[in-house]
Amino acid sequence: MSVDRSKVLSAAQKHLAKGNYDRAIAEYQRLVDEDPADVRTWLKIGDLQTRKGAHKEASDTYRRVAEHYAEQGFFLKAVAVYKQILKLQPNRLDVSLRLAEMYEQLQLVSDALQTYEQAAIAYARQGDAENMLGILDRMAKLDPENIPVRIKYAEALSKAKETERAASEFEAGARLLEEQGRIDDYLKVAERLLYHRPG
């Protein structure tokens, strides 16, 4: 049986006027049960969950909206919603990574790198070297001529005892520095390269 949208919206407004968020959410939920692609109503539910302090539920609701936007190719809208989630739950690395991916889709390289770097730092704090290295690798591939990223990745590989991969990254960084005529920096990186690849 079809839901009468105007009646449901009217009932939700009445509950809101009384400050009864749970009942208003229940009314809006009826609309999305009938039409799961009703993004505006999902956003309204997320907003109400936020107002009542249910940040985990709100984040999950917003995540659903952001994924819908991303699937539809509305990357800017997805970015806005992912940022909303991070305001509620700043430590959500899964959301930070999706935000960085959206920046990549929008070709906003510096924003993507900054967001990836924050995630890499968080993984390092958790002692999760594997995920940290994966993110640094992604950053190096995203902006191959970014010398600080390459060197940071090389140092992380060195720390993880991945000597040959570290040497390759130091070599790439040294080559870029040499091309730019930055001789002092080149010599420092070349020294690190020789440490990893003697002879």
Please name every model-derived segment.
Residues M1-G199:
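Repeat-based scaffolding regions
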